[in-house]
């Protein structure tokens, strides 16, 4: 399924949080996305009822936590209209129904149950999204523990029974992938944390480096697997999150900042450089064993303590050797995000790079991998 239906949206919509209400609640979610490739295609949505990575200290949501019993009541796709600079902040302006929406079914049924940890693929639905138009999505879910993310950066509205409301980062459950039967050269995933996901970039602006890179090479099917607070230790467990990464041809791994800040659940402390390198090595080996080409990123600068900066420097000095040992390419966008000298660890565009930082990081990707004959990935 993952070879036929590939990502066609560059924003991250994985799960690092959970709507844990201890009672069944209903959520109607509507979102607008800019598709990577426009046109008339067959689409399927893909969802996994579990939490991919650990959020903050892990008291509410932690990697591989099971979701609850979810009932999916309805789902739709539609042409969301012209991309016209709308701010998508006033839910009262949203129509009750999406004009021209196509109903999504699941094994020919309009609703379905999603068990804890279950994977769900919808049936296909054919829809035309003209160039310069949004892909609009809506679904209604009921459950007492629904995995989600607060940091998707999409134009999202949530109706909890009092009409659509929006915010900068509403807790909104969304499909893990908007799969599209479209032509592509390769499937390219970005496995990372909030910096990859694009936290602190403008909502609905597609300013993060992953979205900017996707715009540079629309013939590639880009899947943003970045999640706020995510650790390499989360991915190294080789569960629901890394399974997504294994469905790609190339994966750019940019993990480690939160390991140095927070550490893994098991350790209960900040990870040391050697521990982090061991977890990154597990990720490399697992991905390569699945036939995936791995590109390693140096860790970007962050607001670390002086002790953590020492570990950060040690990791960045070790990654090139790790890449040599395992035959990985290197993506060094760390230097372009530095305000000071090399390895000074002074963020130039904010600890979470803003839109300018996203542009600089994407430009570095182009310099590293674009040649006169094409992309070398």
Label each region the model flagged.
Residues 1-191, 196-197, 201-203, 374-377:
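N-terminal secretory targeting modules
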Residues 136, 250-254, 295:
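Structural motif
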Residues 185-190, 195-281, 303-306, 310-313, ...:
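Conserved SGNH/GDSL esterase-like catalytic core that processes O-acyl groups on lipids
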Residues 281-291, 320:
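Surface-exposed amphipathic alpha-helices with a cationic face
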Residues 290-294, 328:
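A short helix->loop->beta-strand "cap" motif at the edges of active sites that frequently abuts
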Residues 301-377:
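Catalytic His-Asp segment of secreted/periplasmic serine-dependent ester chemistry enzymes
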